[in-house]
Regions:
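Short active-site segment of divalent metal-dependent hydrolases/proteases
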Residues: 58-62, 66
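Zn2+-dependent metallopeptidase catalytic core
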Residues: 1-16
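OB-fold/S1-family RNA-binding modules
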Residues: 29-33
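Short helix/loop segments within enzyme catalytic domains
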Residues: 93, 106-125
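Predominantly extracellular/secreted Zn2+-dependent metalloproteases
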Residues: 18-22
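Post-HEXXH active-site segment of zinc metalloproteases
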Residues: 51, 55, 67-101
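N-terminal first-folded block
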Residues: 25-27
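Short pre-active-site segment immediately N-terminal to the catalytic Zn-binding motif
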Residues: 38-57
Length: 125
């Protein structure tokens, strides 16, 4: 069921990666541009927060859109450069990477603007 939901979200953006659910994944999700593959942590339904799952998938969708728009090799190069800059500034390669920050902001904006049931209420906030 979760795979169908992920596929439906990604289809909205005309994204069609290989979708893998992995119980042992050490992060919520990750996108592998070279293989056009997204791996989502398979959390049991009773422990899944639907909003968090949506935002996670949207976050990865932004990476896919960036890779498609820039080209995979250029995206990977820019991502690595941003990670190196973060480390040089004594920050975290992943968490402080500008591509991760942009993807997270975009995911929240998309969720509130399109996917959320109460999107009309959040537009004015």
């Amino acid at each position: 069921m979760k795979k169908i939901i992920v596929k439906s979200i990604l289809d909205h953006y005309n994204l069609h990666p290989v979708i893998i659910l992995d119980k042992d994944l050490d992060v919520k999700a990750k996108y592998i541009p070279e293989e056009d593959k997204v791996i989502i942590k398979d959390i049991p339904p009773e422990k899944t927060n639907p909003k968090d799952m949506f935002i996670t998938v949207l976050h990865e969708a932004k990476h896919m859109l960036d890779a498609r728009n820039l080209g995979i090799s250029k995206f990977l190069k820019k991502y690595a450069q941003a990670g190196t800059v973060a480390v040089y500034c004594d920050k975290d390669y992943h968490d402080d990477n500008k591509w991760e920050i942009r993807a997270e902001k975009w995911a929240h904006k998309e969720y509130n603007g399109y996917w959320s049931e109460d999107r009309e209420e959040t537009k004015g906030a």
